[in-house]
Every structure is written in structure tokens, then in C-alpha cells.
A protein has these predicted regions:
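Rossmann-like adenosine-cofactor binding region
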Residues: 1-51
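C-terminal helix-to-coil terminal segments
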Residues: 42-96
Length: 96
């Protein structure tokens, strides 16, 4: 974070643990970087009283960065297929 320009935005969608959140909060408060976009956190869900939640230059998502209309469609189609299979007591996707 110390090496970033003041105009930089930090984006993390991979692992929350790769960023020290206390250092990040300080950098945002002191305007050492312009902002942050996070989809992952050290502790999930992010606690309601976490300092990041109160910073105007922090965009926070609830770990949904992977979601697309196509993903949702596949997810719900498979969910219905799984439920129907369970209710009918039929095996699903048998591999031999």
C-alpha cells in the first residue's frame, strides 16, 4: 500500500488475508490511496462494526464477485434438478 500512488484504487477479489485491513483503513483515512473495492475480507462476513464499512472511499461487496446472469441460471437450474432428483429418489449424473 505504501508504494501505491495517491490516485490508485486497490481491488481485491481473491483472498482477504493478502491485505492487512488495519493498514488499509489507515491508508484510506489518510488518503494515501484514492479508494478500495473489496469482495473478500480477512473475516467473512465483514463485521457490522468494521471500520471499512464507514469509509466513503471503500466499495464493499458481500463476496459475490463471481456472479453473472449465466452463473445464476446454471446454479438455479442445477438446484432444481438436484431437488427433483432427491424427491423422486433418483440418482443424478451417474458416472461409470
Amino acid at each position: 500500500i505504501e508504494m501505491m500512488k495517491k490516485t490508485s484504487f486497490l481491488i481485491n477479489t481473491s483472498r482477504g488475508q493478502i491485505i492487512n485491513e488495519n493498514d488499509l483503513v489507515d491508508a484510506l483515512k489518510d488518503e494515501k490511496i484514492a479508494g478500495v473495492g473489496l469482495d473478500v475480507y480477512d473475516k467473512e462476513p465483514l463485521p457490522q462494526d468494521h471500520k471499512l464499512r464507514f469509509l466513503p472511499n471503500a466499495l464493499l461487496l458481500p463476496h459475490i464477485g463471481y456472479v453473472t446472469a449465466e452463473n445464476y441460471s446454471k446454479f438455479y437450474s442445477q438446484m432444481i434438478e438436484n431437488l427433483e432428483s432427491c424427491l423422486e429418489n433418483k440418482p443424478l449424473r451417474i458416472i461409470s
